[in-house]
């Protein structure tokens, strides 16, 4: 073999080695990023899950002791919201503005899943005519991730009740409307409605806009209502709102088994890891075969 041929083979080997090293580094970085994304998705899901807060849930047995512990951790905690037949079973907070708890948990820690919070313009004791609450739509059925399901009439009809714990007392919730609107709807998202005529007009607006309603729930301008608002999964600027009447009587929870929260953002990643690994191993085998061919030709 003459000198030019040897130089060519050495050059090919050097280029091959450089390419192999570069591609391997890229693959390792992608795998590292995938592992981090998997861990991060798990953290978001864990922070959003209602089970994280179960130990703080106020009950008749503990007379709110555990709830008071959560309030000691974060004084902005003011209530507990439960919607029967769903995973909506969370403490509720109120900040100085409506941005405070978009990325902050009920424990006051940074969290992409945020917290369920009452509009800063509302009275903290829920004494207003309309009390507006917000929460993220999570695909894992966490936070307000199940609100959109109330657009289905059978789902809406099956889940009529909930309860609200505030100032050491429990109130019943009777859901009577599901509304879809836009984030900029000033009529729906206004508070401090004092005049009786304005209150009735507000109720009429809700019923006119509602996709689903419950005729057996009588709501008047004298009542108090609560709106559970979240982002619509079908529209960037859309908002899905479940509306309930706040009452003195508390209905029992007819649901013994609630559909479990499932983190869809995590599971597909796990499912794809074997395929990714198979592709990586295939590439390595291919590069090894190529290197052997070069050596044989040498």
Question: Can you name each region flagged by the protein language model?
Answer:
Residues 1-16:
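N-terminal Lys/Arg-rich, disordered targeting/topogenic segments
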